[in-house]
């Protein structure tokens, strides 16, 4: 089941397992990002995957930016993240993300994220500190945005 998630006690442990960020950094992000929604995929009432949707614009068009998409290690390879991504693509006209590595480029491409944009075409109405969060964590030599439009 997919539902909106606001409980820091559920968000923080998954975020920490996936990205190794401190609780302080996660709380700073959660408390200071103003245009945000978290969606979680629940398996038997337990959170298994989550992602954040953050308002942004690409070349003046409104998008939902998918950020911090993650799944518990013991719940991977079951399609939970794919279900969340499908939900986003079905419920929002335009969604985008920045793949963190080459493996994820292929993963997202297979899930129909096929429109490519340069990072400087993306704009957020967020503080500079939050913008730093939104662009970090990518190991690609030349990071880029992948998008899906209905």
Regions found by a protein language model. Name each.
Residues 1-28, 35-42, 46-47, 132-150:
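Short amphipathic alpha-helix that is part of the acyltransferase structural core
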Residues 109, 114-136:
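Conserved catalytic-core motifs of GNAT/GCN5-like acyltransferases
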Residues 90-102:
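Conserved GNAT acetyl-CoA-binding A-motif
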Residues 67-68, 76, 105, 110:
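Acidic/histidine-enriched, beta-strand-rich ligand/metal-binding domains
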Residues 10, 102-103:
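Short alpha-helical
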Residues 81, 103-104, 121-126:
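Short glycine/proline-centered loop/turn elements that form peptide/ligand docking sites
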């Amino acid at each position: 089941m997919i539902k909106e998630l606001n409980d820091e006690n559920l968000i923080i442990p998954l975020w920490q397992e996936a990205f190794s960020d401190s609780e302080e950094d996660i709380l700073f992000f959660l408390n200071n990002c103003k245009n945000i929604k978290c969606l979680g995929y629940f398996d038997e009432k337990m959170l298994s995957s989550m992602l954040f949707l953050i308002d942004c614009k690409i070349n003046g068009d409104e998008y939902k930016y998918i950020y911090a998409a993650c799944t518990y290690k013991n719940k991977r390879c079951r399609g939970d993240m794919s279900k969340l991504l499908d939900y986003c693509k079905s419920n929002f006209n335009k969604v985008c993300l920045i793949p963190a590595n080459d493996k994820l480029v292929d993963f997202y491409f297979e899930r129909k994220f096929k429109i490519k944009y340069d990072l400087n075409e993306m704009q957020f109405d967020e503080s500079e500190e939050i913008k730093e969060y939104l662009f970090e964590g990518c190991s690609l030599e030349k990071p880029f945005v992948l998008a899906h439009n209905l």
